[in-house]
């Protein structure tokens, strides 16, 4: 083809860097194991949905082998974030089981037939039959290797620009295909480079196939290895076809025909049996390449996702190198044989600097020299077009080549030697599980979005509901499953509520009038349309506890509480503050009691929360400062509204409030003595959220539902003041302050004290999104 890096060099730098755009996705396999590191023999968990219809969670060869799949996303970071979120969701749902973090299998049953093949019934029975055939050909133990598949598509607009700028005579479709095919050929030629640097399966447990164990040397307790191996998964003992075969990579048609010929000759049972290190993938149009699937990557057991983000960048850099580097010959059978031998050498001898690798001309070279040469080629070819965000990846690549001790295999061998194969990997599995629990409110890759939205999308992903982020800043998403589509904003603004109901909740005057008409108690008060009008009524409010607030407010903005209303200047300040935010202001009697947030979905109270100001409880020996530091270690606490609770601050405001009580940061509270650092109970200032769903009498819940029905709302957060939970609701012992049209769900899902009320699930239920299993039955 008439394509070289010279064409790329002729483009403006800002345009040439677009070559690093595209879409990215990951497929990851993990074996489920028990607490001893033995293969779990239990069925695929029902909590993970139906494996045949779930878009993100399924099984691979074995019923015990979970596969998680991300959708194509426009950056590696987003795709890895989605992968990590799926990993967290799966890990948390497992009961007394763990995700094995290593590509090499865990402790396997002695008899191969005891390894459960993934079960598929009904119309999907063929998938199980196919796996049974693979078991006969390869054995079940060989199929228990797991790995990472990295899916990458090249940027379409860049390819179009490249075609136009290069004044190519061939049609764009042919030009595009040529670029993809050239990239594949060069990847296959040089794949040994990635295996040598990124391999992470150097050791195998003794329960693996006896034929392979007999070839290996003892390494650690119950573990064996090739002395210089980087990736047993990629060598003669690993996950590969029974024989090497050569495909025609000239064009997509040639490739497909050569693959089909192997099926017709019974070399392969099915084209799915092509275990090549890279696959060419099409979708609805079989004549058009959609993306490339890189399949040679081991799980990196030092990372929860199995992927070092910098190594993902390295793979992308390497793929761009394969696109750009010159290609002098077609990928002949002889070249393919050389590439296969190089793969075997890299996988089996990759830690031996003196191992032999054949260069592009077929000449034998020392491995260390060829690594350095390949790095230099990549730097010269790719660096001029490297975006700033990929510089760390390039620097990591340089470290891996120049310092063998920095490679995952080298570090892994030291850990296994010291602790044991099973012991070390189980320690990693437990560490990752704890991290998953600690971060169970995060959608990785979407951490800039509201926490409530992240929670909703997490549960949507677990249910197999696909989603699109329509407006990231507005937290506006589209949910879709089995032909059903719903739009949601800020997790709780949905199609279930009509526009007039939202307006009624937004306008506090209207809210009060509607509730009054329904005979539901609200604070007595008046509305004012000018500061002078409100100030004129000061004599009426003097000496009474009042609340001054804008007509339309949220998050407590513009609200002033005056409990002893004896100073006109304080009253005037409150009026001025409220009118800064709204043209109409309410002045109401202050309602006594404690404030409770009722969350209502479809005429049901699904959560009730009480908020307590920032505080610490003494242990008799620690100062307030130490107690705050310790309390802030809770993984639910963070900064910037990215966690369910905020860290308690030790600043001037807290210092002044402590001083007003006769305390300081150095005060040592008595055991069980509670000291408050703030007067307001906002979560945003370090307050505690306490679940009261099961403690509030039913009479108050009934009133809350009546209030929601009066405004004809299906999802709302209702704030109610209650004098005492020891009494049932009466005419004078409660008051509804307001109803909110976009209430946060995260405070109910992860309270400081109490259980998760799963409001994310409740909203998905209300919208009609079932689990993946039920969706599959309906589809």
Swiss-Prot record:
Name by which UniProt lists this protein: Glutathione biosynthesis bifunctional protein GshAB
Keywords, sorted A to Z: ATP-binding, Glutathione biosynthesis, Ligase, Magnesium, Manganese, Metal-binding, Multifunctional enzyme, Nucleotide-binding
Region ranges (Glutamate--cysteine ligase): 1-346
The EC number(s) this enzyme carries: 6.3.2.2, 6.3.2.3
Gene designation: gshAB
Record text on cofactor binding: Binds 2 magnesium or manganese ions per subunit.
Cofactor list: Mg(2+); Mn(2+)
UniProt pathway: Sulfur metabolism; glutathione biosynthesis; glutathione from L-cysteine and L-glutamate: step 1/2; Sulfur metabolism; glutathione biosynthesis; glutathione from L-cysteine and L-glutamate: step 2/2
Subunit structure: Monomer.
Gene Ontology MF terms: ATP binding; glutamate-cysteine ligase activity; glutathione synthase activity; metal ion binding
GO cellular component, one term: cytosol
Residues the record lists as binding Mg(2+) 2: 738, 740
Catalytic activity: L-cysteine + L-glutamate + ATP = gamma-L-glutamyl-L-cysteine + ADP + phosphate + H(+); gamma-L-glutamyl-L-cysteine + glycine + ATP = glutathione + ADP + phosphate + H(+)
Binding residues annotated for Mn(2+) 1, in chain numbering: 719, 738
Entry similarity comment: In the N-terminal section; belongs to the glutamate--cysteine ligase type 1 family. Type 2 subfamily.
Function recorded in the entry: Synthesizes glutathione from L-glutamate and L-cysteine via gamma-L-glutamyl-L-cysteine.
Record flagged with keyword Ligase: yes
Amino acids binding ATP: 539-597
Residues given in the record as Mg(2+) 1 binding sites: 719, 738
């Amino acid at each position: 083809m008439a394509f070289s890096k010279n064409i790329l060099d002729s483009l403006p730098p800002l345009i040439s860097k677009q070559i690093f755009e595209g879409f990215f996705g990951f497929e990851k396999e993990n074996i489920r194991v028990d607490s001893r590191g033995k293969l779990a023999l239990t069925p695929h968990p029902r909590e993970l949905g139906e494996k045949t219809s779930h878009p993100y969670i399924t099984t691979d060869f074995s019923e015990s082998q979970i596969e998680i799949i991300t959708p194509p996303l426009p950056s590696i970071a987003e795709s890895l974030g989605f992968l990590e979120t799926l990993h967290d969701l799966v890990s948390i749902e497992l009961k007394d089981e763990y995700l094995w973090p290593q590509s090499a299998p865990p402790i396997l049953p002695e008899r191969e037939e005891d390894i459960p093949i993934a079960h598929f019934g009904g119309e999907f029975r063929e998938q199980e039959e196919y796996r049974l055939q693979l078991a006969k050909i390869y054995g079940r133990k060989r199929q228990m290797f797991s790995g990472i598949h990295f899916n990458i598509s090249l940027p379409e607009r860049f390819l179009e620009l490249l075609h136009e700028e290069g004044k190519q005579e061939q049609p764009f479709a042919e030009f595009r295909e040529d670029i993809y095919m050239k990239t594949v050929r060069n990847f296959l030629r040089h794949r040994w480079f990635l295996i040598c640097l990124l391999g992470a399966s150097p050791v195998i447990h003794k329960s693996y196939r006896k034929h392979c164990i007999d070839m290996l040397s003892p390494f650690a307790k119950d573990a064996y290895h090739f002395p210089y191996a980087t990736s047993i998964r990629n060598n003669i003992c690993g996950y590969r076809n029974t024989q090497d075969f050569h495909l025609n990579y000239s064009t997509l048609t040639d490739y497909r025909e050569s693959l089909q010929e192997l099926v017709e000759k019974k070399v392969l049972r099915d084209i799915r049996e092509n275990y090549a290190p890279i696959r060419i993938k099409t979708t609805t149009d079989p004549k058009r390449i959609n993306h490339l699937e890189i399949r040679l990557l081991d799980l990196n057991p030092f990372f929860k996702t199995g992927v070092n983000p910098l190594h993902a960048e390295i793979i992308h850099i390497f793929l761009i190198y394969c696109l750009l580097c010159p290609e002098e010959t077609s990928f002949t059978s002889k070249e393919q044989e050389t590439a296969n031998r190089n793969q075997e050498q890299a996988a089996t001898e990759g830690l031996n600097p003196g191992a032999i690798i054949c260069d592009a001309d077929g000449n034998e070279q020392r491995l260390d020299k060829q690594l350095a040469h390949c790095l230099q080629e990549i730097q010269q070819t790719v660096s001029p077009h490297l975006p700033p965000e990929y510089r760390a990846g390039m620097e990591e690549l340089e470290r891996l080549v120049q310092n063998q001790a920095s490679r995952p295999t080298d570090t892994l061998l030291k850990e296994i030697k010291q602790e044991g194969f099973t012991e070390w990997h189980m320690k990693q599995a437990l560490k990752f599980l704890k991290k998953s629990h600690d971060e169970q409110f995060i959608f990785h890759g979407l951490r800039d979005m509201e926490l409530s939205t992240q929670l909703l999308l997490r549960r949507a992903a677990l249910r197999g509901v696909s989603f699109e982020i329509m407006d990231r800043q507005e937290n506006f998403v589209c949910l879709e499953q089995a032909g059903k589509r719903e739009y949601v904003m800020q997790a709780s603004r949905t199609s279930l509520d009509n526009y007039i109901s939202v307006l009624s909740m937004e306008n506090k005057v209207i809210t009060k009038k509607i509730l009054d008409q329904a005979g539901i108690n609200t604070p007595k008060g008046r509305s004012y349309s000018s500061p002078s009008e409100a100030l004129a009524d000061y004599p009426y409010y003097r000496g009474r506890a009042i609340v001054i607030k804008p007509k339309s407010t949220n998050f407590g903005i513009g609200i002033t509480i005056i409990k002893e209303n004896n100073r006109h200047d304080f009253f005037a300040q409150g009026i001025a503050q409220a009118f800064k935010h709204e043209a109409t202001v309410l002045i109401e009697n202050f309602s006594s009691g404690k404030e409770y947030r009722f969350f209502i979905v479809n005429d049901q109270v699904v959560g009730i929360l009480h908020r307590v100001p920032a505080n610490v409880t003494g242990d008799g020996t620690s100062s307030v400062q130490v107690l705050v530091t310790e309390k802030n270690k809770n993984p639910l606490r963070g900064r910037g509204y990215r966690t369910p609770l905020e860290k308690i601050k030790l600043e001037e405001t807290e210092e002044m409030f402590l001083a007003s009580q006769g305390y300081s940061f150095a005060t040592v509270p008595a055991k069980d003595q509670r000291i408050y650092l703030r007067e307001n109970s906002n979560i945003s200032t370090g307050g505690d959220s306490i679940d009261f769903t099961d403690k509030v009498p039913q009479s108050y819940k009934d009133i809350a539902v009546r209030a929601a029905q009066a405004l004809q709302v299906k999802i709302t957060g209702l704030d109610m003041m209650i004098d005492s939970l020891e009494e049932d609701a009466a005419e004078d012992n409660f008051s509804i302050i307001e109803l909110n049209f976009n209430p946060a769900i995260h405070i109910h899902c992860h309270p400081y004290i109490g259980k998760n009320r799963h409001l994310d699930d409740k909203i998905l239920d209300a919208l009609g999104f079932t689990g993946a299993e039920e969706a599959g039955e309906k589809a």
